[in-house]
A protein has these predicted regions:
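S-adenosyl-L-methionine
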Residues: 2-113, 150-184
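Active-site segment flanking the S-adenosylmethionine/decSAM binding pocket
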Residues: 172-212, 216
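Glycine-rich SAM-binding Motif I of class I
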Residues: 126-130
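Conserved SAM-binding motif I beta-strand of class I
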Residues: 139-144
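C-terminal substrate-binding/active-site "lid" region of AdoMet-derived donor-dependent transferases
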Residues: 198-251
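Conserved class I S-adenosyl-L-methionine
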Residues: 115-124
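Residues in the short beta-alpha loop(s) of Rossmann-like NAD(P)-binding domains
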Residues: 146, 156, 226
Length: 252
């Protein structure tokens, strides 16, 4: 088996600071760096730990491990420079998928999810992959940068059992979401703020290239769209749904 990539905390912090300094200047970037470290220290308190375990109902119901409470200090610190691990609430996810099934792009027949591959960028421990399996996707793929979270996701996928499961081709891949090759065929891409703005722009450009090279329908479900403007600036994607907690973009 090939060894999984290991991410250096110091190298990640250095790259984060260099990028911030290039746009903001040395002193503002350094101030932000200390702010990140202070927030990490606050996030390590017992009260914050209890809050991270607050969404454990899903794990109890399905005997899996997807909460953020059990994430170690190293992965939490890395998350401060990328995007902190936060599992998706089931109610919000199913609302987004129901919106897709109602065909917001105007197709009277609705989307036939059997034609679509579901891809979660920044899939963490795999909760979204498990919830997506309630729908008849052709295939479900998660991309996770941190090897420790990826390994937990694999365990969750192996032991998950649900009477409502409709898709059984589930896979977690340990890789950099900004450098992947997207699967062929129609796609549903799920984002829950997995990347800083620079990384999200690389994802968008990569996605635009693959849509131009191989035209097909691609839907982007953007949960908690703090960086929505990155996709709003695209000439390939257009916004078709804007709700309080999410936005939906589609190609064409």
């Amino acid at each position: 088996m090939d060894s999984l990539p290991q991410i250096s905390v110091l190298q990640t912090a250095w790259q984060w600071w260099r990028y911030a300094a290039a746009f903001e200047g040395y002193f503002p970037a350094t101030s932000r760096l200390f702010g990140v470290l202070w927030e990490f220290a606050r996030d390590s308190t017992p009260e914050r730990l209890r809050q991270r375990y607050g969404d454990a109902d899903y794990d109890w119901d399905y005997r899996v491990n997807t909460t953020s409470g059990a994430v170690g200090w190293r992965d939490r610190l890395l998350g401060m420079f990328h995007s902190s691990y936060q599992p998706t609430e089931p109610a919000a996810f199913h609302e987004m998928l129901n919106t897709l099934e109602q065909s917001p792009a105007g197709d009277q027949n609705g989307l036939d999810l059997r034609d679509y591959t579901f891809v979660d960028l920044g899939s963490g421990k795999g909760r979204t992959l498990l919830m997506a399996s309630d729908y008849p996707f052709r295939r479900i793929v998660g991309i996770e940068l941190l090897s420790s979270l990826h390994l937990i996701a694999q365990q969750n996928l192996d032991q998950y059992k649900s009477e409502s499961q409709k898709c059984f081709l589930l896979e977690s891949i340990c890789a950099d979401a900004t450098a992947i090759s997207f699967p062929d065929g129609p796609l549903v891409l799920y984002l829950f703020n997995p990347l800083p703005e620079s990384g999200l722009r690389r994802v968008r450009l990569n996605l635009e290239r693959t849509v131009r090279a191989h035209p097909r329908p691609v839907y982007v479900l953007y949960h908690n769209p703090l960086l929505e403007h990155v996709f709003a600036e695209s000439t390939v994607f257009r916004k078709i749904v804007g709700a309080l907690q999410y936005s939906v973009f589609c190609s064409g």
